[in-house]
């Protein structure tokens, strides 16, 4: 089964509400939808970045250019079922650009799984679970609005874990914001925070203990991504769990963080690692070091979220659950099928491959004009 064609499409999908982070406010998400054709079948994948190149080194524009000009010409004519060869070819030809590689890797997994009439989860080893506890992100920047949102989610039995974005205000203001949310949800929910690199080590060392006292269970990426030493010291000094996100940008960074036991948990993201196989390798590194895995998101659409669900469903342990909220943050979906959240958990889609199919009318509607 030879690869016959690889196509890319940039789509821009508005969010239902602005998401305020320490580094930007997100009003829309841009994705590159990849379709790989072989043997009469089409596999689909997705690449993207939160807020474009502000968060990382890639954007929808760079992802499309790398695939169209470097990766696609390299892979056309190759065996679509040989996933290892495809990864090796991409890594030799292109340095970095992990989201571009991930988009193709996901599409090839989807294609192979469809050809074998298997789900991706079954293709890569089988499921440990059919659903995963899912956290909702509170990022309106308004305390009353965030509390109302949390209480509505609890009442609807959609979410009882909440992640609050910090770093856009002063630490003192953030602390009061958190205290109000923790008090409002009481014992009905847990609260974790994401600083998105917004603090230096001194600020983090002062305010993380206060967040812990307020009832926070986990602090995500409190300091800049390159400061592994600060992460290690903060992990050693605090009882609350420290989660690496932006710092976890390659297999080598996973090894360094694990070797030094610099954090308590890894936020896994397929686009950060270059695809499915490398994400599984990072999870294995974490397991060997006694570090927890967490199901992270790049605010993926239904395509990327389905791919992540298949991967996370195979892992032995996810004590903090996941945050695969992208499809519900967006104002519309790009697939024919919805994903389901029920009883505080997101459920693995059924069917071969990803378990979702593109809605080509929606893709055309959101395609960026040339």
Swiss-Prot record:
<feature type="binding site">
    <location>
        <position position="245"/>
    </location>
    <ligand>
        <name>Mn(2+)</name>
    </ligand>
</feature>
<feature type="binding site">
    <location>
        <position position="194"/>
    </location>
    <ligand>
        <name>Mn(2+)</name>
    </ligand>
</feature>
<dbReference type="GO" id="GO:0030145">
    <property type="term" value="F:manganese ion binding"/>
</dbReference>
<keyword id="KW-0058">Aromatic hydrocarbons catabolism</keyword>
<dbReference type="InterPro" id="IPR029017">
    <property type="entry name" value="Enolase-like_N"/>
</dbReference>
<dbReference type="GO" id="GO:0018850">
    <property type="term" value="F:chloromuconate cycloisomerase activity"/>
</dbReference>
<dbReference type="GO" id="GO:0018849">
    <property type="term" value="F:muconate cycloisomerase activity"/>
</dbReference>
<dbReference type="InterPro" id="IPR013370">
    <property type="entry name" value="Chloromuconate_cycloisomerase"/>
</dbReference>
<dbReference type="InterPro" id="IPR036849">
    <property type="entry name" value="Enolase-like_C_sf"/>
</dbReference>
<comment type="pathway">
    <text>Aromatic compound metabolism; 3-chlorocatechol degradation.</text>
</comment>
<keyword id="KW-0413">Isomerase</keyword>
<dbReference type="InterPro" id="IPR013342">
    <property type="entry name" value="Mandelate_racemase_C"/>
</dbReference>
<feature type="active site" description="Proton donor">
    <location>
        <position position="323"/>
    </location>
</feature>
<dbReference type="InterPro" id="IPR013341">
    <property type="entry name" value="Mandelate_racemase_N_dom"/>
</dbReference>
<feature type="binding site">
    <location>
        <position position="220"/>
    </location>
    <ligand>
        <name>Mn(2+)</name>
    </ligand>
</feature>
<dbReference type="GO" id="GO:0009063">
    <property type="term" value="P:amino acid catabolic process"/>
</dbReference>
<dbReference type="InterPro" id="IPR018110">
    <property type="entry name" value="Mandel_Rmase/mucon_lact_enz_CS"/>
</dbReference>
<dbReference type="Pfam" id="PF02746">
    <property type="entry name" value="MR_MLE_N"/>
</dbReference>
<protein>
    <recommendedName>
        <fullName>Chloromuconate cycloisomerase</fullName>
        <ecNumber>5.5.1.7</ecNumber>
    </recommendedName>
</protein>
<keyword id="KW-0464">Manganese</keyword>
<keyword id="KW-0479">Metal-binding</keyword>
<dbReference type="InterPro" id="IPR029065">
    <property type="entry name" value="Enolase_C-like"/>
</dbReference>
<comment type="similarity">
    <text>Belongs to the mandelate racemase/muconate lactonizing enzyme family.</text>
</comment>
<dbReference type="Pfam" id="PF13378">
    <property type="entry name" value="MR_MLE_C"/>
</dbReference>
<feature type="active site" description="Proton acceptor">
    <location>
        <position position="165"/>
    </location>
</feature>
């Amino acid at each position: 089964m030879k690869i016959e064609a690889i196509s890319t499409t940039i789509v821009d999908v508005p969010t239902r509400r602005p998401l305020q982070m320490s580094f930007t406010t997100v009003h829309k998400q841009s994705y590159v939808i990849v379709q790989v054709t072989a043997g009469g079948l089409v596999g689909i994948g997705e690449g993207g970045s939160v807020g474009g190149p502000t968060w990382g080194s890639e954007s929808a524009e760079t992802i499309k250019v790398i695939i169209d000009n470097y990766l696609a010409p390299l892979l056309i004519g190759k065996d679509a079922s040989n996933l290892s060869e495809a990864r090796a070819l991409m890594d030799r030809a292109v340095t970095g650009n992990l989201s571009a590689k991930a988009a193709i890797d996901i599409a090839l997994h989807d294609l192979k799984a469809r050809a074998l009439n298997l789900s991706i989860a079954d293709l890569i080893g089988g499921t440990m679970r059919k659903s995963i506890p899912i956290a909702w992100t509170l990022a309106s920047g308004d305390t009353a609005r965030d509390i109302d949102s949390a209480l509505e989610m609890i009442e609807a039995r959609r979410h009882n874990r909440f992640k609050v974005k910090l770093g856009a205000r002063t630490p003192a203001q953030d602390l009061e914001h958190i205290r109000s949310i923790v008090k409002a949800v009481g014992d009905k929910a847990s609260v974790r925070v994401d600083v998105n690199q917004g603090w230096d080590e001194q600020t983090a060392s002062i305010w993380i203990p206060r967040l812990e006292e307020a009832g926070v269970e986990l602090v995500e990426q409190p300091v800049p991504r390159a400061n592994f030493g600060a992460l290690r010291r903060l992990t050693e000094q605090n009882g609350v769990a420290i989660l690496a996100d932006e710092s976890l940008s390659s297999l080598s960074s996973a090894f360094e963080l694990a070797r030094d036991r610099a954090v308590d948990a890894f936020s896994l993201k397929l686009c950060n690692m270059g695809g499915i196989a490398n994400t599984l390798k990072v999870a294995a590194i974490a397991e060997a070091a006694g570090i927890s895995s967490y199901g992270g998101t790049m605010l993926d659409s239904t395509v990327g979220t389905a791919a992540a669900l298949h991967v996370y469903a195979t892992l032995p342990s996810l004590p903090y659950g996941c945050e695969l909220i992208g499809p519900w943050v967006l104002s519309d979906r790009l697939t024919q099928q919805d994903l389901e959240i029920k009883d505080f958990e997101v459920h693995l889609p059924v069917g071969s491959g990803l378990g979702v199919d593109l809605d080509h009318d929606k893709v055309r509607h959101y395609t960026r004009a040339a």
